[in-house]
Amino acid sequence: MKIDRENKVYTIAFTFIITFAFVIVLSLINNATEPTVKKNQELLKVKAILNAMDISYLSDDEALDKFRNDVQKVENDKYEIYKTTSGGEEIYALIFSGSGLWGTITGVLAVDSSLSTIKGIDFISQSETPGLGGRIEENWFKDQFRDEKVADGMVSVSVTKTDGSKEDGKVDAVTGATLTSK
């Protein structure tokens, strides 16, 4: 018996079978890689917290060890907060998220115990345009937050060039990525 490949029923059945096969394969791959993906996401979060708190590490294993030994989670129903002590000073890190141009930006902001000076910032995830909003991952952008004084209870982002003062609570935005910088 010869199959009529020009028949609409054949086309629909063939498309359904191929689609079903690919869905099964992709589901199996997704399930097989899920633990690794979760582990890597947790590692990115740990490294971002350590970076914001200015805790150095040389490897992924060292980062995990330092996080387990030096950083404690602060019990809070509303926010995800961590703390450490460095040079006799307590440093707090807050996980934050907000809207960028293409999706949610999730990061870590570390402040001193008086909440008056930013100790550092790092980003856990972002999906901004490479070369524009994606530049928030670059060290020059993150470094300008370090030791910035919190003015009027908040740090603002200036879209124009600032004078580089750490006392005014302003940092430079990424040129061409105004929405991401906010």
Please tell me what each predicted stretch does:
Residues 2-182:
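Flexible, solvent-exposed loop/hinge segments and secondary-structure transition points
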